[in-house]
Amino acid sequence: MASATDTVSAGSTPRDKVVTRFAPSPTGFLHIGGARTALFNWLYARHHGGTYLLRIEDTDRARSTDAAIDAIFDGLEWLGLGGDEPAVFQFARSDRHAEVAHKLLEAGHAYRCYLTQEELAARRELAQAERRPFRIDSEWRDATPDQWPADQSYVVRMKAPREGETTIVDKVQGSITVQNSELDDFIILRSDGTPTYMLAVVVDDHDMGVTHVIRGDDHINNAFRQLVIIRGMHAIEGGWPDPVYAHIPLIHGADGAKLSKRHGALGVDAYRDEMGLLPEAVFNYLLRLGWGHGDEEIISREQAVAWFDIGDVNKGASRFDLKKLLNLNGHYIREADDARLAALVAPRLATLAPGFAPDKGLDLLTRAMPVLKVRAADINELAAGSVFLFAQRPLAMAEKAASLLTDDARAILTKVAGVLEAENVWTTGVLEATVKQMAEELGIGLGKIAQPLRASLTGQTTSPGIFDVLALLGKDESLSRIRDQAA
């Protein structure tokens, strides 16, 4: 049991090696806040040459699903945040958790509590009526075995200290003090003998060798209760040092409200599959949510590992800004390898462009990337922008594009087809020079040719540079599309 006045200081317990952990509950997909927690744990371990572990807290059997577990692992791997060792599954360790509970019980740090649900409800109502906090004050706390009733179910509660105070010097939040009188005798074993979350977390962290507990600041209150267990076990057998705590602030929406889907907060899988974001962009954006290095906005993984320290994380809540994330993704799209982008775009073209065949179209898609990615903010935009390359003739015309194809414009296209037919060198530069010369000879502006030409080649009013489009489509396909729309 913890002593009356205790302080656990960040860094007060010497360890040979930093060990962090990310411990999600598989009751839903990996959300953006969880991904950032994983990132900070991964970075802190990497920065200190330590180990980063994963634990699946699947004790809520009714809500835990295999699909959620798979999505968590998939999302972490996509972000490059897979664990250094095989993941630990909490439910499988229930016997170990119960073993620790019985040690605490036998040593007098915990006790059997026979209070019924009706008794607890009555005491809770009385506390509400008297407008005071409800605290468990069980008459069973100091009962002896001969006083235990036969054939009556019980829970096992920790004996929380009642006098003095406990202070945690948190790596992020600083010094936090709680009066021990505010701690209640919380349950560690339910009446059916199953361990509670509060106990399981402590036992797993100890057995996994976790030295630094980095998690959301909604767990601050849990830390004081978990220390009661830790110090109880340390008093019994030693070797249960206090962890270093770092409670990071939650993420809010741009309006300061609790983060939700309306702010663009989705599961990590949705950022990849639905929004078409790159993992390096999400990694970089999450890194900058509550932490920074000067004015640096673009930070590589290597730089992040070198610069990151958990003590530099802001205390205040960060605000999620979807627009900034998309802008950052656009930067990484432009920096990305063309073949990689083409491979990411290809699956989306199965529905967008029926004429796309991966075995034949991937090379063209790769060659088109340098001009396509200049305008795109995500993989979806890249896919949409590349559809014209694989469109089937005759092209379906967007309404605005069709409006450009007047009789005069179609007559110009006929002349363009004739001039280009004679061109033997089919490159962007040569094609541009040829069309510009034609415009001069006709005494018209380049736009008078370029606009209907774009419509005939793409079916749209916007596209990459028109001469890039001609070069990518090739001579035969370009001339066929132009003649489809010519007078």
Swiss-Prot record:
This is Glutamate--tRNA ligase 2. Keywords: Aminoacyl-tRNA synthetase, ATP-binding, Cytoplasm, Ligase, Nucleotide-binding, Protein biosynthesis. Monomer. GO terms for molecular function: ATP binding; glutamate-tRNA ligase activity; tRNA binding; zinc ion binding. Its main location: cytoplasm. It is an enzyme of class 6 (ligase). It holds the Pfam family Anticodon_2. InterPro entries: aa-tRNA-synth_I_cd-bd, aa-tRNA-synth_I_codon-bd_sub2, aa-tRNA-synth_I_CS, aa_tRNA-synth_I_cd-bd_sf, Glu-tRNA-ligase_bac/mito, Glu/Gln-tRNA-synth, Glu/Gln-tRNA-synth_Ib_cat-dom, GluQ/Sye. Its EC number is 6.1.1.17. A motif ('KMSKS' region) lies at residues 258-262. It comes from the Bacteria. GO terms for biological process: glutamyl-tRNA aminoacylation. Belongs to the class-I aminoacyl-tRNA synthetase family. Glutamate--tRNA ligase type 1 subfamily. GO terms for cellular component: cytosol. It catalyses: tRNA(Glu) + L-glutamate + ATP = L-glutamyl-tRNA(Glu) + AMP + diphosphate. It is found in: Cytoplasm. HAMAP family: Glu_tRNA_synth_type1 (MF_00022). It comes from Novosphingobium aromaticivorans (strain ATCC 700278 / DSM 12444 / CCUG 56034 / CIP 105152 / NBRC 16084 / F199). The keyword RNA-binding does not apply. A motif ('HIGH' region) lies at residues 24-34. The keyword Lipid metabolism does not apply. Catalyzes the attachment of glutamate to tRNA(Glu) in a two-step reaction: glutamate is first activated by ATP to form Glu-AMP and then transferred to the acceptor end of tRNA(Glu). ATP binds at K261. The gene is gltX2. Gene3D superfamilies: 1.10.10.350, HUPs.
